[in-house]
Amino acid sequence: MHKLKLHGFNNLTKSLSFCIYDICYTKTADDRDGYIAYIDEQYNANRLTEILTETCSIIGANVLNIARQDYDPQGASVTILVSEEPIDPRDVDTSEHPGPLPNSVVAHLDKSHICVHTYPESHPEGGLCTFRADIEVSTCGVISPLKALNYLIHQLESDIVTIDYRVRGFTRDINGVKHFIDHQINSVQNFMSEDMKSLYHMMDVNVYQENIFHTKMLLKDFDLKHYLFNVNPEELSAAERKRITDLLYHEMQEIYYGRNLPVL
């Protein structure tokens, strides 16, 4: 897509929001409480602040203010208000390709924010526990927050990821013509590295005419030991391993497809 010569500031708002899920099986009530405490500590407000601050560095944003809070009995929230950095928009790469991990990318932001909220969850029946983190990166300016997607998914290793990207508002060129998007995009997947895409099953649901792009991701490899908390697979009978595997698989399928499915 050719570069637009704009009249004034780029007023497009680009928002990336995604949910990441971590699934776990616990055998006892104590193990369930232990998992919730463990995951709550792993993703406390301080660690989330570090991740989001690095995200700001990747997209080149200035941190104006940080609000963070851990909750009782569990959960955490972090919101960072960021501002623009004065750069020449002609120097910004808007092509579709994966963003960097620790390297810096310039951005042009105004009244933008990055926020995350966590939701540990469990139920006394079945032994399943889930951890969900909701993340939103919203920017006004010349680049897409999708540049931070690669880094964030690498940092928050997950079993299931649902991603929504949308562009809202419009900007005008020097002739007064409105432009409702200023970069090419066919799929959110184009902003992910090949190694990441190889790890997940992916499905797109895009509404191109509305500038809405949706991608779902489900981890391909299933190793039971990675889903057990304080339980060794070798200590379980073959029948018990199959029962737990079926339980976990069914839970992940329901979350991935976003609906209740019949138990086979």
UniProtKB/Swiss-Prot annotation:
The keyword Lyase applies. The record marks 111-112 as: Cleavage (non-hydrolytic). It comes from Pectobacterium atrosepticum (strain SCRI 1043 / ATCC BAA-672). Belongs to the prokaryotic AdoMetDC family. Type 2 subfamily. Keywords: Autocatalytic cleavage, Decarboxylase, Lyase, Polyamine biosynthesis, Pyruvate, S-adenosyl-L-methionine, Schiff base, Spermidine biosynthesis, Zymogen. Heterooctamer of four alpha and four beta chains arranged as a tetramer of alpha/beta heterodimers. InterPro entries: AdoMetDC_fam_prok, S-AdoMet_deCO2ase_bac, S-AdoMet_deCO2ase_core. It catalyses: S-adenosyl-L-methionine + H(+) = S-adenosyl 3-(methylsulfanyl)propylamine + CO2. Its EC number is 4.1.1.50. Its cofactor is pyruvate. This is S-adenosylmethionine decarboxylase proenzyme. GO terms for biological process: spermidine biosynthetic process. Binds 1 pyruvoyl group covalently per subunit. Is synthesized initially as an inactive proenzyme. Formation of the active enzyme involves a self-maturation process in which the active site pyruvoyl group is generated from an internal serine residue via an autocatalytic post-translational modification. Two non-identical subunits are generated from the proenzyme in this reaction, and the pyruvate is formed at the N-terminus of the alpha chain, which is derived from the carboxyl end of the proenzyme. It comes from the Bacteria. The modification Pyruvic acid (Ser) is found at residue 112. Gene3D superfamilies: S-adenosylmethionine decarboxylase (3.60.90.10). GO terms for cellular component: cytosol. The gene is speD. The active site is at 112 (schiff-base intermediate with substrate), 117 (proton acceptor), 140 (proton donor).
